[in-house]
Amino acid sequence: MVDATPIRPRSAATVTKWDYEADVVVAGYGIAGVSAAIEAARAGADVLVLERTSGWGGAAALAGGFIYLGGGTPLQKACGFDDSPENMKTFMMAALGPGADEEKITDYCEGSVAHYNWLVDCGVPFKESFWGEPGWEPPFDDGLMYSGGENAAPFNEIATPAPRGHVPQMDGKRTGEKGGGYMLMKPLVETAEKLGVRAEYDMRVQTLVTDDTGRVVGIVAKQYGKDVAVRARRGVVLATGSFAYNDKMIEAHAPRLIGRPGAAIEEHDGRSILMAQALGADLAHMDATEVAFLCDPQLVVRGILVNGRGQRYVPEDTYSGRIGQMTLFHQDNQAFLVIDEASYEEGAAATTATPFLRAQPKWAAETVEELESDMGLPAGALQSTVEVYNKHAAEGSDPLLHKKSEWVKPIGSPVAALDLRGFTLGFTLGGLRTTVNSEVLHVSGEPIPGLFAAGRCTSGVCAGGYASGTSLGDGSFYGRRAGISAAKQN
């Protein structure tokens, strides 16, 4: 059990025997860890990865596989979309804040095309096809999709819409079992193995090891119940994931997720953050969280979402993660989908990757007035909402929230409502403050010697908002930087 207390380092002077040694030691074999291992090995370092579980993959291998890339990648161009680093940055600064790290986002956008090419060179496959329907991810093996609300209000007025959700090609994928994330991780691990990267499994990192100057020189881990000391001759890379499954840290830093299921894996217990904190590591955006909204987007887009007062509050055609944040943060987790019979049947028949998120209506009625009464909403509240919506929908517009005209249609009869109260879960976005070279920063602003980090144990490009693919995107991008930086150390 890990609590929220910083985990003190061990002095190298007390280590009588190093059980393992390498130039660069990487804690965690998910997307950030494997990317760090590849680049460190390519830089000539002897690399050892310590993985807590019995196999590689981490949360990345179970994910849908979105990697947020843009700026004019070959895949974007092949699918007929124009994009630029400047346009990508404009969207990310608007969508991932407030307080987004402009230096990191600029760096990420300018390096995005090269990062796509790096992934392809490592064997990650992308099919040159675009999926344009609403959804959490493509239901087939299409390689490109909108994954952050780029084509929805307000962002489609801030930056030119461009899809940036790049998905590794995989037939018969099953998110949570063997999804697109598996086809991201598999070729990267194979690349690492070809480069001579070693891996030790069932290694639960316990604490960092420092020398008398304060430099990080290793890790103590527990393997099969026994403490083992691992020496890092050049540097240690922390890549063990978020703190979504550390209840004490959630209570201390991200209380909006208290009681919400974690959209992560239970190994995400924040230990790397606590180990680095004991060395004086600075933290950033620890309250930031992504929130998933658990209703199939093919249904949501065809109705109207209302809160506990019967009022609309978000354009229904936007990114589901944005809907989740707006629902949990601003509507007390109260949400109902009001939809007529014809639209419900159309949405239920539409192709989707998430048919298991198609909830059944809880209430149905011939009129909105009856539905409102059955739902227990204030008299007239839902009626006025639907009246205003239908008035403009008859003209194909939504001047209130600016849902795109293709999804705007008057709500007819019979009409139903889905009870979506509490249909959210989330994961944390905050963590260690790092430089663009993935150096872990001390609260003084100086890098901690010998210590690097990437992935969800750090605060990456997301400071509050989110787009699907940014975790795997900046995890791999800054994982590479961590490996390069660690390998350069003397």
Language model region names:
Residues L69-Y108:
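Glycine-rich active-site loop/strand segments that organize a redox cofactor
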Residues R42-A63:
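Glycine-rich FAD pyrophosphate-binding loop
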Residues T207, R215, A381-G465:
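A glycine-rich dinucleotide-binding beta-alpha-beta segment and adjacent secondary-structure elements
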Residues D107-G225, D247-K248, A393-G412:
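Conserved redox-cofactor binding core of oxidoreductases
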Residues G179, Q223-F293, L472, Y478-R481:
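Glycine-rich loop(s) and the adjacent beta-strand/alpha-helix scaffold that form part
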Residues A22-V49:
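N-terminal Rossmann-like FAD-binding beta1-loop-alpha1 element of flavoenzymes
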Residues D269, I273, D282-A381:
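An anion/pyrophosphate-binding glycine-rich loop and adjacent beta-alpha core
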Residues M1-V24, R42, V461, G465:
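Extreme N-terminal leader/targeting segments of oxidoreductases
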